Design a protein with these regions (language model features):
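Conserved catalytic cores of phosphodiester-cleaving nucleases, focusing on short active-site segments
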Residues: 16, 21-24, 30, 41-82, ...
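DNA major-groove recognition helix of helix-turn-helix/homeodomain DNA-binding modules
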Residues: 177-192
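Acidic-basic catalytic patches of nuclease active cores, encompassing PD-(D/E)XK
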Residues: 1-34, 189-238
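Conserved hydrophobic/aromatic packing and binding residues within compact polymer-binding modules
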Residues: 139, 153-154, 164-167
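The alpha-helix within a helix-turn-helix
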Residues: 143, 154, 183
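Short alpha-helical DNA-recognition segment
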Residues: 46, 147-162
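Recognition helix of helix-turn-helix/homeodomain-like DNA-binding domains
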Residues: 158-173
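Charged, structured surface patches that assemble and position nucleic-acid processing machinery
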Residues: 4-6, 78-80, 85-86, 92-132, ...
Length: 322
């Protein structure tokens, strides 16, 4: 078992390095997140283009808790979420095709390279079906040039008038079979490229919006923040304990545990700084009565606001008033 785990860790390290090399090649500023150490974590890399990356050897091996964390973080920090792995269900991922794990986009390093090169990575898999990303403006123009009504085109490709209307609005995309019929009629010009941010917003953000109130009802701290007008979620597998937002103002809270040690608290803060430097959020470290080492605190004060736990509610009220 230990040998298997070691091999998996080695493969993950290779994928991580490949991913970082690709990001560097495309002049993207990225940071590795290293908390929690030696345990499963939901965030491995953050990128300044508002992208959160989880690395896995096989996308199916990533736990539900990590997936949930990744979804919550992406919504609260207004970022695209993507899993980079080599395989899914022990099958090699196909270059140029974006797969899906619980509504999060999955791709191999080669597809990430193509995507960042502005190549037409157009095929993606969601909820049991393959789709092709269509350029709605080009489709509309081609249809008008051919003097076809929405209904006429719908009949030609075997779909509904409403579906064609949604393709042109880019509110939905056709299946591979339907896309092939459109390409035969109008050419490759109507094919576009996926946008990781759009896919995350379309498939992940709606889910998070639905569960925000449920989470707030179950947790006293989140309920208090919700009543103040702060959308917030608790994260379990990464550095910040809570991330929240008031309109476009994003906030990360790192909360000191009564029985935790200073080193762990500092490590959480340092990794939260990395996340927020790339994704744009203010950081508040909430201290228990134990406090934190004076020297460590001094080194972090330029990037973090420290607040005593009993003053947290006052701080949150001030954030809402701003």
């Amino acid at each position: 078992m230990r040998r298997t785990s070691s091999i998996r860790d080695e493969r993950i390290a290779v994928i991580l390095r490949k991913t970082l090399d690709i990001l560097k090649k495309h002049n993207m500023d990225a940071d590795i997140i290293e908390y929690p150490r030696g345990e499963r974590r939901s965030v491995d890399i953050v990128v300044n283009k508002r992208i959160i990356i989880k690395i896995g050897r096989d996308a199916s091996e990533i736990s539900r808790e990590e997936i949930e964390d990744l979804k919550l973080a992406s919504k609260m920090l207004d970022s695209a979420a993507v899993i980079i792995s080599e395989t899914y269900l022990n099958e090699d991922l196909e270059p140029g095709v974006v797969m899906d794990r619980s509504d999060i986009s999955v791709m191999d390093p080669e597809t990430l390279d193509l995507y960042l090169s502005n190549e037409k990575v157009a095929i993606y898999y969601k909820r049991g079906h393959f789709f092709v990303k269509i350029n709605g403006v080009a489709l509309h123009r081609k249809r008008i040039e051919r003097m076809l009504s929405l209904g006429e085109l719908a009949e030609m490709i075997g779909t509904s008038r409403k579906a064609v209307y949604e393709y042109e609005r880019e509110a939905m995309d056709p299946s591979i079979e339907t896309a092939q019929k459109l390409i035969e009629l109008f050419g490759e010009e109507i094919v576009s490229r996926i946008d990781l941010h759009e896919l995350t917003e379309r498939y992940v953000y709606g889910y998070v919006n639905k569960i925000l109130k449920i989470h707030a009802q179950e947790d006293p701290m989140l309920r208090k923040m919700y009543e103040m007008g702060i959308e917030a979620v608790k994260l379990k597998r990464t550095a910040p304990d809570i991330v929240g937002r008031i309109e476009d103002q994003k906030t990360a809270l790192v909360i000191q545990r009564d029985r935790g040690d200073d080193n762990e608290m500092v490590e959480k803060i340092v990794n939260t700084i990395k996340i927020c430097a790339k994704l744009g959020c203010e950081i508040y470290a909430v201290l228990s009565n134990r406090g934190i080492d004076r020297e460590a605190k001094k080194k972090l004060e330029d990037n973090v606001t420290f607040v005593e736990r009993e003053k947290l509610e006052h701080l949150l009220k001030n954030l809402v008033r701003r």
